[in-house]
Amino acid sequence: MAEGERQPPPDSSEETPPAAQNFVIPKKEIHTVPDMGKWKRSQAYADYIGFILTLNEGVKGKKLSFEYKVSEAVEKLLALLDTLDRWIDETPPVDQPSRFGNKAYRTWYAKLDEEAEGLVAAVVPAHLAAAVPEVAVYLKESVGNSTRIDYGTGHEAAFAAFLCCLCKIGVLRVDDQIAIVFKVFNRYLEVMRKLQKTYRMEPAGSQGVWGLDDFQFLPFIWGSSQLIDHPFLEPRHFVDEKAVNENHKDYMFLECILFITEMKTGPFAEHSNQLWNISAVPSWSKVNQGLIRMYKAECLEKFPVIQHFKFGSLLPIHPVTSG
């Protein structure tokens, strides 16, 4: 149960600015299936899941239109995402025989690869400039794979890790929690959906109809938390087209459902069987708890996803330190 888990604040290092910290370029540490034990015992895993759960608690019962603080750091992150969006417009798909995986994506990605540190430097204050190369790696990892032209939950996790790192160095703070999900992550989703559509990206490691979604997972977790104790919307309503059309602008979960129905044809129960099953769960709190368990089992504990995760000084591979 999410409420019962310890939830370290996302900016637990705020009291001690990491000026003297030795930042490093993150690298892969999970090379074989037996290495997964190292990941599950790591400080990185504890901090990552703690971050996800803290945000889950922060958005509980709140609409996207809820009033919350938007800090300068959040505004700068939105400007960064606007830049990525603009680059898509400047890099149209090329004519090619294959329907999927448009090669223009590689041109778009090469620009990000080149500019990532500059983009992150514009978000991070000058006294934390040493952190930029480390943090920028997670941004580059969060937009898909340029070799395979695919995108999946591992890339989404890299963006959450990027935000977690910004919290750990104090760029984002406790009172940014709601804006992190409703503003920054929501804008990230818009840009990723545009990438997926424009370049016909393949789903990375998709489980087909048996997976939750081809591309995302976190907006279903945070989106179900938003709907906890809703006066009239119940899980059974998200398969109702009218309910989705009338409420998707307020709830991430319903926005995800709308995107799926736009992208897929045929009966919902056939193309999205897992979600169809979830619509039978009686309450949003049960949906939320079940999705957190499923995220751990299907994403965070799966070697094909975690083998690509990178570890540095902010999200370290060493075992959890008590205290």
From Swiss-Prot:
Function: PPIases accelerate the folding of proteins. It catalyzes the cis-trans isomerization of proline imidic peptide bonds in oligopeptides. Acts as a regulatory subunit for serine/threonine-protein phosphatase 2A (PP2A). Modulates PP2A activity or substrate specificity, probably by inducing a conformational change in the catalytic subunit, a proposed direct target of the PPIase. Can reactivate inactive phosphatase PP2A-phosphatase methylesterase complexes (PP2A(i)) in presence of ATP and Mg(2+).
Taxonomic placement: Eukaryota, Metazoa, Chordata, Craniata, Vertebrata
InterPro entries xref list: Phstyr_phstse_ac, PTPA_C_lid, PTPA_sf
EC number: 5.2.1.8
GO CC term (a single one): protein phosphatase type 2A complex
Binding site for ATP: 148, 153-154, 304, 307-308
Reaction catalysis annotation: [protein]-peptidylproline (omega=180) = [protein]-peptidylproline (omega=0)
Gene name tied to this protein: PTPA
Keywords: Acetylation, ATP-binding, Cytoplasm, Isomerase, Magnesium, Metal-binding, Nucleotide-binding, Nucleus, Rotamase
Organism: Oryctolagus cuniculus
Annotated localization: Cytoplasm; Nucleus
Tissue-specificity statement: Widely expressed.
Highest taxon above the source species: Eukaryota
Residue ranges, annotated region (Disordered): 1-21
GO terms for biological process, alphabetical: mitotic spindle organization
Assembly description: Associates with the serine/threonine-protein phosphatase 2A PP2A(D) heterodimeric core enzyme, composed of a 36 kDa catalytic subunit (subunit C) and a 65 kDa constant regulatory subunit (PR65 or subunit A). Interacts with the catalytic subunit PPP2CA (via C-terminus). Interacts with PPP2CB.
Chain sites annotated for binding Mg(2+): 208, 214
Sequence similarity: Belongs to the PTPA-type PPIase family.
Protein name, as recorded: Serine/threonine-protein phosphatase 2A activator
Pfam families xref list: PTPA (PF03095)
PANTHER family recorded: SERINE/THREONINE-PROTEIN PHOSPHATASE 2A REGULATORY SUBUNIT B (PTHR10012), SERINE_THREONINE-PROTEIN PHOSPHATASE 2A ACTIVATOR (PTHR10012:SF0)
Record-level Gene Ontology MF annotations: ATP binding; metal ion binding; peptidyl-prolyl cis-trans isomerase activity; protein homodimerization activity; protein phosphatase 2A binding; protein phosphatase regulator activity; protein tyrosine phosphatase activator activity
Location of N-acetylalanine modifications: 2
